[in-house]
Amino acid sequence: SAASDVYKRQIKDWDSRWYARDEKVGDLIVEDNKIRKFVKKSLYGAGVPKIEIERSNDVVTLFVHCARPGMVIGKDGAEVEKLRLAVEALIGKKVKLNIVEVRNPDMNAQLVAENIAQQLEKRISHRRAMKNAMGRAMRAGAKGIKCCCSGRLGGREIAGVEHYHEGTIPLQ
């Protein structure tokens, strides 16, 4: 139940850090969403769990957290520059792009989930994909992990849900 969950604001920070007049907030939230979708799609293979956005008067600063920064930056920062120009073209504002490395990708829930999804796209068995991901997370030092896959698993006609868990998962 929600009552037994940890209060999220104590353990997580906002992904958008800016303040605006009331009439602009809606447009800026939509713009943030557009930026996130575009960057996530552009860097699909690089493992991007989180994109933080800060705004000052006329500059939008993006902090792109990624598992494989070399792939994002490219040779002499060419790929980063290409991405920055593409985002500038998308929103029509000046953009600063900072790449932040994710220290331990096997401990990041978003990256573990995306990794399982990529394996399912390659037609690997859902059981094996989940067990492999859970094993890697536990070896990386996680105290516990719970994993769930749902849908037409293995091409079945009737959709189902499969759960696996390992270690301790107190109160979420």
Predicted regions and their residues:
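Short beta-strands and strand-coil junctions in structured, solvent-facing domains, enriched
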Residues: 59, 69-72, 135, 144, ...
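Short, small-residue-biased leader/transition segments that mark boundaries at the very start
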Residues: 1-7
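Acidic-enriched and Gly/Ser
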Residues: 23, 31-127
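Elongated, mostly alpha-helical coiled-coil "stalk/stator" tethers of large membrane protein machines
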Residues: 99, 116-117, 133, 137, ...
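Beta-rich strand-turn-strand
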Residues: 126-127, 131, 136-144
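Short, hydrophobic/π-rich interface segment
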Residues: 138-140, 148-172
